[in-house]
């Protein structure tokens, strides 16, 4: 999976298209990511001893990894490629050529 936790990304599809934010969690088994402030859903919580009234909580839902592009240090969004630098495999931005790792 080309996106990692902590990467700054731009959403390229969906209702939050154009938003730039940080990846909170990567879910490689299902090829999805949770991005801060993107795809907000309302989750109903049952009443419990901590919250006897119950609640409606807003949280981020996972979005497919193909709907985001990783930003480099200069804020250029592009596809991610892999190459070897000094015998170490690193990710790089294919548009700008800048190393991401």
Swiss-Prot record:
| A GO cellular component annotation in the UniProt record | ribonucleoprotein complex
Any one of the GO BP annotations: translation
Q: Which GO terms describe its molecular function?
A: rRNA binding; structural constituent of ribosome
Query: What are the protein's UniProt keywords?
Result: Ribonucleoprotein, Ribosomal protein, RNA-binding, rRNA-binding
User: Domain of life of the organism in this record?
Assistant: Bacteria
Among SUPFAM superfamilies, the record links this protein to: Translation proteins SH3-like domain (SSF50104)
Tagged with keyword Ribonucleoprotein:
yes
Per the record, a Pfam family?
KOW
Write out the function statement from the record.
One of two assembly initiator proteins, it binds directly to the 5'-end of the 23S rRNA, where it nucleates assembly of the 50S subunit. One of the proteins that surrounds the polypeptide exit tunnel on the outside of the subunit.
Q: Which family does it belong to?
A: Belongs to the universal ribosomal protein uL24 family.
**How would you summarize the oligomeric state and partners of this protein?**
Part of the 50S ribosomal subunit.
Q: What is this protein called?
A: Large ribosomal subunit protein uL24
The top of its lineage is: Bacteria, Bacillati, Bacillota, Bacilli, Lactobacillales
